Amino acid sequence: MLRKLRFFTVIAMLSVVLGMRATSTVATPCDDVSTDTLRVSLITCAPGPEVYQLFGHSAMRVQRSGVDGFDLVFNYGVFSFSDDFILKFTQGHTDYMLAVYDFQYFLIDYVMRGSTVYEQELNLTHAQREALFDALCINARAENRVYRYNFLYDNCATRPRDRVEQALSLMGEHVVYAPVDTLYTFRELIRHYGANYSWLTFGIDLALGRELDSEATWHEHMFVPMLLQRACDEAVVVNDSTMHERRLVSATRELFHSDVVPINPPTPWYLSPMACALLLLAITIFITLRDVRTGRLSRWYDTLLGVVMCLSGVVIYFLVICSEHPATSFNLHALWLTPCAIMPAVLPYVRKAMPVARWYHTVNVVLILLFALLVVCGVQCVDSAVWPLVAVSLIRSLNFVFYYKRNLIK
């Protein structure tokens, strides 16, 4: 009964929102728009609660009225969650595809999700609209629709933008995006849209390296659908020959409005990465002081830390060496999180291996200091919760080195 009620409620809402007229019409339309029934729009959906919805979503809508009319969405954000999806995503081998289907099915999905949906009708000539539609149809063919997803440079937002720019360039025109006062790095953009998901941003900060800290151009900012919407709203189309300008967007509509942003609440401070890291640091200091006082070494604790750091190091080095994802090839976290961390987890139990363990801990201290120096010099930005974890590793390594030197290990 509740499902039926919800279904009919959504249908009623769609009946209202689909009948809404444009909230604003700013630009002067092209000369032949009134005689042509083909309309092309950029669709932008506000962020949702799932990880893959945090940045919002973009798609293309193409409509034609008349007896042969249609209302289609060209959606570049479709993927298959197969058994090996996680492995492929980690390797950077994730394939997305362009799906074409009735726009109403697309809209109802976001209505039920509670995400606001915007439509920006593009101010294109008849020839440009036809060329763009033809390009989208060719792209949607079975042999062309699959593409290698890149979350920064080739995603559901950059693809529609690029198709529009290509259609214009074929007709001797190009898009000029209005400049902005402030540009951000990729890491700053990810942190902004993932602000309520502290563990997600913490993991991204660990996994992605120095490239994420380069300042993105305004064009590169548009991998975020909401920023693409803003850029298109202020953009103009310039004719290469006459230098005549017109607005890229002729009308903006709000197809569905949600008063509640469907984003999860922030992580409680006591469950945040920083709180957990500080707790681990406090435990480490307590155990280390007890080791100093009793003259013994808590091998069990070093084993636990070593196993966790080893597994983290395996992931980091896999991303650095094997992954095709952007911003993974140069990562300073590889200095203090390495697969070699398994050594302090195992070697202290073998007396003859103590010199090797001391060698590892000595090198670890040097690498941690190098990591801190490079971060302080601005080579790479790191999450603040990393510092207590680095301190944990440093304290245990220094503890082992001093214990070995004083020959206090029993």
Which ranges hold each PLM region?
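A cross-kingdom signal targeting lumenal/periplasmic-facing segments of multi-pass membrane
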Residues: 78-170
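Glycine-rich catalytic cores of cysteine/serine-nucleophile enzymes that process amide/ester linkages
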Residues: 36-114
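Activation targets extended, charge/polar-rich intrinsically disordered C-terminal tails
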Residues: 138-346, 352-357, 361, 365-410
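Alpha-helical membrane-anchoring segments
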Residues: 28-34, 51-53, 262-266
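Bacterial Sec-dependent N-terminal signal peptides
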Residues: 1-30, 409-410
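Membrane-proximal intrinsically disordered regions of secretory-pathway and membrane-system proteins
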Residues: 26-33, 250, 404
